[in-house]
A protein has these predicted regions:
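Extracytoplasmic metal-acquisition and chelation regions
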Residues: 21-307
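Sec-dependent signal peptide recognition
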Residues: 5-12
Length: 307
Protein backbone atom coordinates (compact mmCIF):
# COMPACT_ATOMS: atom_id res chain seq x y z
CA UNK A 1 0.00 0.00 0.00
CA UNK A 2 2.79 2.41 0.95
CA UNK A 3 4.60 1.53 -2.28
CA UNK A 4 1.44 2.29 -4.30
CA UNK A 5 1.07 5.65 -2.53
CA UNK A 6 4.68 6.55 -3.36
CA UNK A 7 4.11 5.69 -7.01
CA UNK A 8 0.91 7.79 -7.05
CA UNK A 9 2.70 10.81 -5.53
CA UNK A 10 5.55 10.51 -8.04
CA UNK A 11 3.03 10.34 -10.89
CA UNK A 12 1.27 13.50 -9.64
CA UNK A 13 4.56 15.38 -9.27
CA UNK A 14 5.64 14.36 -12.75
CA UNK A 15 2.32 15.49 -14.22
CA UNK A 16 2.59 18.87 -12.47
CA UNK A 17 6.13 19.33 -13.76
CA UNK A 18 4.95 18.66 -17.30
CA UNK A 19 2.21 21.25 -16.94
CA UNK A 20 4.77 23.75 -15.71
CA UNK A 21 7.08 23.25 -18.67
CA UNK A 22 6.89 25.87 -21.40
CA UNK A 23 6.16 24.58 -24.88
CA UNK A 24 8.62 26.67 -26.87
CA UNK A 25 6.94 25.87 -30.16
CA UNK A 26 3.72 27.87 -30.66
CA UNK A 27 0.72 25.91 -31.83
CA UNK A 28 0.98 27.18 -35.42
CA UNK A 29 4.01 24.92 -35.80
CA UNK A 30 6.36 27.73 -36.83
CA UNK A 31 9.61 28.73 -35.20
CA UNK A 32 8.96 32.17 -33.72
CA UNK A 33 11.70 34.79 -33.62
CA UNK A 34 11.33 38.17 -31.93
CA UNK A 35 13.72 40.88 -33.12
CA UNK A 36 14.37 44.38 -31.84
CA UNK A 37 15.39 46.93 -34.48
CA UNK A 38 13.92 47.07 -37.97
CA UNK A 39 17.37 46.42 -39.49
CA UNK A 40 17.58 43.07 -37.70
CA UNK A 41 13.96 42.26 -38.51
CA UNK A 42 14.63 42.79 -42.21
CA UNK A 43 17.79 40.66 -42.10
CA UNK A 44 16.16 37.72 -40.31
CA UNK A 45 13.20 37.81 -42.69
CA UNK A 46 15.59 37.56 -45.64
CA UNK A 47 17.42 34.55 -44.21
CA UNK A 48 14.58 32.79 -42.39
CA UNK A 49 12.04 33.19 -45.17
CA UNK A 50 8.94 31.03 -44.87
CA UNK A 51 10.53 28.67 -42.34
CA UNK A 52 10.25 31.15 -39.47
CA UNK A 53 7.78 33.71 -38.15
CA UNK A 54 9.53 37.01 -37.41
CA UNK A 55 8.06 39.68 -35.17
CA UNK A 56 9.89 42.99 -34.75
CA UNK A 57 9.39 45.10 -31.64
CA UNK A 58 10.53 48.41 -33.15
CA UNK A 59 9.10 49.95 -36.28
CA UNK A 60 9.94 52.94 -38.47
CA UNK A 61 11.15 56.03 -36.62
CA UNK A 62 11.60 54.23 -33.29
CA UNK A 63 14.69 55.12 -31.25
CA UNK A 64 16.20 51.91 -29.78
CA UNK A 65 18.26 53.88 -27.25
CA UNK A 66 15.07 55.02 -25.50
CA UNK A 67 12.80 52.04 -26.19
CA UNK A 68 11.14 50.44 -23.17
CA UNK A 69 9.40 47.08 -23.30
CA UNK A 70 5.63 47.11 -22.83
CA UNK A 71 3.73 44.26 -21.18
CA UNK A 72 2.83 43.09 -24.66
CA UNK A 73 6.49 43.06 -25.67
CA UNK A 74 7.46 40.98 -22.64
CA UNK A 75 4.71 38.51 -23.54
CA UNK A 76 6.00 38.24 -27.12
CA UNK A 77 9.55 37.72 -25.88
CA UNK A 78 8.45 35.10 -23.34
CA UNK A 79 6.67 33.10 -26.05
CA UNK A 80 9.49 33.26 -28.59
CA UNK A 81 11.69 30.38 -29.66
CA UNK A 82 14.54 32.80 -30.27
CA UNK A 83 15.29 36.48 -29.60
CA UNK A 84 17.71 38.40 -31.80
CA UNK A 85 18.87 41.86 -30.78
CA UNK A 86 21.68 44.22 -31.74
CA UNK A 87 23.72 44.47 -28.53
CA UNK A 88 26.51 46.82 -27.36
CA UNK A 89 23.86 48.57 -25.25
CA UNK A 90 21.98 49.88 -28.29
CA UNK A 91 18.78 48.65 -26.63
CA UNK A 92 19.95 49.90 -23.25
CA UNK A 93 16.56 49.82 -21.53
CA UNK A 94 15.95 46.19 -22.56
CA UNK A 95 19.10 44.64 -21.09
CA UNK A 96 17.34 43.39 -17.94
CA UNK A 97 14.52 41.93 -20.03
CA UNK A 98 17.01 40.00 -22.18
CA UNK A 99 18.69 38.61 -19.06
CA UNK A 100 15.31 37.47 -17.80
CA UNK A 101 14.63 35.69 -21.10
CA UNK A 102 18.00 33.94 -20.90
CA UNK A 103 17.07 32.67 -17.44
CA UNK A 104 13.89 31.28 -18.98
CA UNK A 105 16.14 29.28 -21.34
CA UNK A 106 15.04 31.22 -24.42
CA UNK A 107 17.83 31.45 -26.99
CA UNK A 108 18.79 35.14 -26.91
CA UNK A 109 21.35 36.33 -29.45
CA UNK A 110 23.19 39.64 -29.93
CA UNK A 111 24.24 40.11 -33.56
CA UNK A 112 27.17 42.25 -32.41
CA UNK A 113 28.76 39.01 -31.17
CA UNK A 114 29.49 38.26 -34.82
CA UNK A 115 32.15 40.96 -34.87
CA UNK A 116 35.68 40.86 -33.51
CA UNK A 117 36.30 43.53 -30.87
CA UNK A 118 39.11 44.99 -32.99
CA UNK A 119 36.53 45.81 -35.68
CA UNK A 120 34.45 47.86 -33.25
CA UNK A 121 34.80 51.58 -32.64
CA UNK A 122 35.42 52.40 -28.99
CA UNK A 123 33.47 54.96 -27.00
CA UNK A 124 35.40 58.13 -26.16
CA UNK A 125 33.49 58.41 -22.87
CA UNK A 126 33.56 54.82 -21.59
CA UNK A 127 36.66 52.69 -22.12
CA UNK A 128 34.82 49.36 -21.99
CA UNK A 129 31.97 50.38 -24.30
CA UNK A 130 31.71 50.40 -28.06
CA UNK A 131 29.75 52.31 -30.67
CA UNK A 132 26.63 50.17 -31.26
CA UNK A 133 25.76 51.48 -34.77
CA UNK A 134 27.52 48.56 -36.45
CA UNK A 135 25.14 48.27 -39.44
CA UNK A 136 26.59 51.38 -41.11
CA UNK A 137 29.50 49.41 -42.52
CA UNK A 138 28.22 46.87 -45.04
CA UNK A 139 31.19 44.61 -44.28
CA UNK A 140 29.90 44.29 -40.72
CA UNK A 141 26.45 43.44 -42.03
CA UNK A 142 27.94 40.69 -44.19
CA UNK A 143 29.52 39.08 -41.13
CA UNK A 144 26.27 39.44 -39.21
CA UNK A 145 24.38 37.78 -42.08
CA UNK A 146 26.66 34.74 -41.86
CA UNK A 147 26.29 34.68 -38.06
CA UNK A 148 22.48 34.79 -38.16
CA UNK A 149 22.41 32.04 -40.79
CA UNK A 150 24.51 29.82 -38.52
CA UNK A 151 22.25 30.51 -35.53
CA UNK A 152 19.13 29.61 -37.49
CA UNK A 153 20.79 26.50 -38.93
CA UNK A 154 21.75 25.31 -35.45
CA UNK A 155 18.22 25.90 -34.15
CA UNK A 156 16.52 24.29 -37.17
CA UNK A 157 19.07 21.89 -38.73
CA UNK A 158 16.38 20.39 -40.95
CA UNK A 159 16.27 23.72 -42.83
CA UNK A 160 19.99 24.56 -42.83
CA UNK A 161 20.37 24.27 -46.62
CA UNK A 162 17.42 26.62 -47.07
CA UNK A 163 18.94 29.20 -44.72
CA UNK A 164 22.35 28.83 -46.34
CA UNK A 165 20.88 29.45 -49.80
CA UNK A 166 18.95 32.52 -48.62
CA UNK A 167 22.05 33.92 -46.92
CA UNK A 168 24.07 33.43 -50.11
CA UNK A 169 21.47 35.36 -52.11
CA UNK A 170 21.44 38.17 -49.55
CA UNK A 171 25.24 38.33 -49.39
CA UNK A 172 25.33 38.76 -53.17
CA UNK A 173 22.89 41.67 -52.83
CA UNK A 174 25.14 43.23 -50.19
CA UNK A 175 28.12 42.85 -52.53
CA UNK A 176 26.24 44.78 -55.22
CA UNK A 177 25.21 47.39 -52.63
CA UNK A 178 28.85 47.98 -51.68
CA UNK A 179 29.79 48.53 -55.31
CA UNK A 180 26.92 50.96 -55.90
CA UNK A 181 27.49 53.11 -52.83
CA UNK A 182 31.26 53.20 -53.30
CA UNK A 183 30.73 54.41 -56.87
CA UNK A 184 28.35 57.16 -55.74
CA UNK A 185 30.55 58.28 -52.84
CA UNK A 186 33.52 58.46 -55.23
CA UNK A 187 31.76 61.37 -56.98
CA UNK A 188 32.09 63.45 -53.79
CA UNK A 189 35.57 64.96 -53.24
CA UNK A 190 37.19 63.86 -49.99
CA UNK A 191 37.45 67.45 -48.72
CA UNK A 192 33.65 67.64 -48.84
CA UNK A 193 33.08 64.42 -46.92
CA UNK A 194 32.03 66.05 -43.66
CA UNK A 195 28.86 64.57 -42.20
CA UNK A 196 27.10 66.50 -39.41
CA UNK A 197 24.04 64.77 -37.92
CA UNK A 198 21.75 64.79 -34.89
CA UNK A 199 23.68 62.12 -32.97
CA UNK A 200 26.83 60.04 -33.33
CA UNK A 201 25.31 57.21 -35.37
CA UNK A 202 27.53 57.31 -38.46
CA UNK A 203 31.05 56.59 -37.19
CA UNK A 204 31.23 53.18 -38.89
CA UNK A 205 30.00 54.81 -42.09
CA UNK A 206 32.68 57.48 -41.74
CA UNK A 207 35.44 54.96 -41.14
CA UNK A 208 34.41 52.78 -44.07
CA UNK A 209 33.89 55.56 -46.60
CA UNK A 210 36.34 58.25 -45.39
CA UNK A 211 33.93 60.80 -43.96
CA UNK A 212 34.66 63.08 -41.04
CA UNK A 213 31.60 62.52 -38.84
CA UNK A 214 30.27 64.92 -36.21
CA UNK A 215 27.19 64.22 -34.10
CA UNK A 216 25.44 66.81 -31.94
CA UNK A 217 24.61 64.17 -29.35
CA UNK A 218 26.80 61.27 -28.32
CA UNK A 219 26.47 57.60 -29.21
CA UNK A 220 23.14 57.44 -27.39
CA UNK A 221 20.17 59.78 -27.74
CA UNK A 222 19.43 59.33 -24.04
CA UNK A 223 21.31 62.58 -23.34
CA UNK A 224 20.29 65.90 -24.89
CA UNK A 225 22.74 68.11 -26.77
CA UNK A 226 23.63 71.19 -24.72
CA UNK A 227 24.39 74.77 -25.73
CA UNK A 228 28.13 74.04 -25.73
CA UNK A 229 27.60 71.09 -28.10
CA UNK A 230 25.65 73.32 -30.48
CA UNK A 231 28.25 76.11 -30.41
CA UNK A 232 31.17 73.71 -30.83
CA UNK A 233 29.51 72.04 -33.82
CA UNK A 234 28.57 75.42 -35.31
CA UNK A 235 32.24 76.45 -35.17
CA UNK A 236 33.23 73.21 -36.92
CA UNK A 237 30.70 73.86 -39.71
CA UNK A 238 31.95 77.41 -40.27
CA UNK A 239 35.65 76.48 -40.12
CA UNK A 240 35.22 73.68 -42.66
CA UNK A 241 32.62 75.44 -44.84
CA UNK A 242 30.14 72.58 -44.47
CA UNK A 243 27.18 73.12 -46.82
CA UNK A 244 24.56 70.91 -45.16
CA UNK A 245 23.60 69.19 -41.92
CA UNK A 246 21.20 66.29 -41.53
CA UNK A 247 18.30 65.36 -39.31
CA UNK A 248 17.48 61.73 -38.47
CA UNK A 249 14.20 59.87 -38.74
CA UNK A 250 14.39 58.52 -35.18
CA UNK A 251 15.65 61.69 -33.44
CA UNK A 252 13.72 64.96 -32.86
CA UNK A 253 14.78 67.64 -35.36
CA UNK A 254 14.86 70.55 -32.91
CA UNK A 255 18.57 70.19 -32.04
CA UNK A 256 19.63 70.28 -35.69
CA UNK A 257 17.37 73.28 -36.30
CA UNK A 258 19.00 75.02 -33.31
CA UNK A 259 22.39 74.23 -34.83
CA UNK A 260 21.33 75.66 -38.19
CA UNK A 261 20.13 78.85 -36.49
CA UNK A 262 23.42 79.17 -34.57
CA UNK A 263 25.45 78.85 -37.77
CA UNK A 264 23.27 81.25 -39.75
CA UNK A 265 23.51 83.83 -36.95
CA UNK A 266 27.28 83.92 -37.57
CA UNK A 267 26.86 84.86 -41.24
CA UNK A 268 27.47 81.36 -42.58
CA UNK A 269 24.64 79.66 -44.42
CA UNK A 270 24.04 75.98 -43.81
CA UNK A 271 21.01 74.07 -45.04
CA UNK A 272 19.29 70.95 -43.78
CA UNK A 273 20.36 68.41 -46.38
CA UNK A 274 17.59 65.95 -45.68
CA UNK A 275 16.48 63.25 -43.28
CA UNK A 276 18.71 60.22 -42.81
CA UNK A 277 17.66 56.83 -41.48
CA UNK A 278 19.95 56.10 -38.56
CA UNK A 279 18.58 53.81 -35.84
CA UNK A 280 15.52 52.59 -37.76
CA UNK A 281 14.50 51.80 -41.33
CA UNK A 282 11.74 53.54 -43.25
CA UNK A 283 8.12 52.45 -43.46
CA UNK A 284 7.43 48.81 -44.41
CA UNK A 285 6.63 48.41 -48.08
CA UNK A 286 8.90 51.26 -49.16
CA UNK A 287 12.46 50.87 -50.53
CA UNK A 288 13.75 52.56 -47.36
CA UNK A 289 11.94 49.91 -45.32
CA UNK A 290 14.78 47.51 -46.18
CA UNK A 291 18.42 47.66 -45.10
CA UNK A 292 19.65 47.88 -48.69
CA UNK A 293 17.12 50.55 -49.67
CA UNK A 294 17.88 52.55 -46.52
CA UNK A 295 21.61 52.54 -47.24
CA UNK A 296 21.13 53.65 -50.84
CA UNK A 297 18.78 56.43 -49.77
CA UNK A 298 21.19 57.71 -47.12
CA UNK A 299 24.19 57.75 -49.45
CA UNK A 300 22.24 59.49 -52.22
CA UNK A 301 20.93 62.11 -49.77
CA UNK A 302 24.37 62.77 -48.26
CA UNK A 303 26.25 62.99 -51.56
CA UNK A 304 23.69 65.25 -53.24
CA UNK A 305 23.53 67.65 -50.29
CA UNK A 306 27.30 67.97 -49.81
CA UNK A 307 28.35 68.36 -53.47
Amino acid sequence: MIQLMKQFILLVLFSVSLLGCKDTRPKDGKFHIVTTTSMITNLVQNIGGEKVAVQGLMGAGVDPHLYKASEGDVSKLSNANMIIYSGLHLEGKLVEVFEKMKRQKIKTIAVSDALDKKELIGSTLFASNYDPHIWFDVKNWEQITIYVEKQLSEALPEHKEYFKANAAIYLEKLKVLKQEIEAEIATLPEDKRRLVTAHDAFNYFGKAYKFDVVGLQGLSTATEAGVQDVQKTATYIIDHKVKAVFIESSVPRRTVEALQAAVNSKNHEVVIGGTLFSDALGNPGTPEGTYIGMFKFNVHTIVNALK
